[in-house]
Curated annotation (Swiss-Prot):
It is found in: Cytoplasm; Endoplasmic reticulum; Golgi apparatus; Membrane. It is a multi-pass membrane protein. The chain crosses the membrane at residues 98-118, 144-164, 179-199. This is UPF0494 membrane protein PB2B2.07c.
Length: 250
């Protein structure tokens, strides 16, 4: 004689709950998922085409964008330097160099954000890190804080004065700890003095770089000398205007 329970199990379709006779979709979906995960069921070509290749193309686009940006930066900088400062001399008597540096830093922060979407990326990260109740405040103050941090980091990095003052403080602290450390501090002070002799050059090189990045951000092109119109009112690092036509006549 056949067992009634075994006969019932044979009659009931798979995927149905025996007690309530409702379809158990969880087991069916699990079985399908396991079936699709088998190595012979995975289409590697579709996986590469739909997932891996788009991500790789996106990374390549970002890399090419950065390379193009840097290439244009140094190309335009070379044209500007060779045309306006053929002998390499730069005036250091300008009192506007610090305001100009701050203004250029502000402009370059927006230029970097425009080209590489720094603010949007960091804003998403900040918004996801905050609790839902604080999301309104993070959307307002998040971009402001990002811009301020970018400006401070850029200003400190380009001025190159912050490491100098920090080293001087370290030297003063070392000189008070003993004779041996005082000798090391004196040696470090000599190195700092040597670096201080070149700080003006570093400062004005940062002026050049900032000026050229702003030109690139505003889509301004520096043409050769044959195009005098582009150079009629070219601003210099002294806050003046350089007239190529007057310069050629003189």
């Amino acid at each position: 004689m056949s067992n009634p329970e075994s006969a019932k199990k044979q009659v009931d379709p798979p995927g149905y709950n025996e007690l309530f006779m409702v379809r158990d979709t969880r087991n069916v979906d699990l079985e399908r998922g396991l079936e699709l995960c088998k190595p012979e069921k995975v289409n590697k070509q579709n996986l590469f085409t739909n997932i891996i290749k788009p991500q790789k193309d996106k990374i390549n686009i970002k890399t090419d964008k950065i390379k193009f940006f840097l290439n244009n930066l140094f190309t335009e900088f070379s044209k500007f330097h060779d045309s306006c400062y053929p002998d390499g001399r730069i005036s250091t008597r300008s009192k506007l160099r610090w305001p100009l540096l701050i203004i250029w830093c502000i402009l370059i922060v927006f230029a970097i954000d425009k080209n590489f979407e720094v603010k949007d990326f960091l804003s998403i990260w900040i918004n996801e890190s905050f609790i839902n109740e604080n999301r309104f405040y993070s959307e307002i103050w998040g971009p402001i804080a990002i811009y301020i941090c970018l400006f401070i980091l850029l200003l400190l990095g380009l001025i190159c004065m912050f490491p100098l003052h920090l080293c001087r403080v370290c030297v003063l602290a070392l000189r008070e700890t003993g004779m041996i450390i005082a000798v090391l501090g004196a040696a470090l002070g000599m190195i700092i003095a040597a670096l201080g002799a070149t700080i003006t050059g570093l400062l004005y090189f940062s002026h050049w770089a900032l000026y050229k990045v702003v030109i690139l951000a505003l889509d301004l092109k520096i043409e050769p000398f044959k195009d005098e119109i582009a150079f009629l009112t070219l601003p210099t690092h002294n806050g003046e205007t350089l007239s190529i036509r007057d310069n050629n006549q003189s």
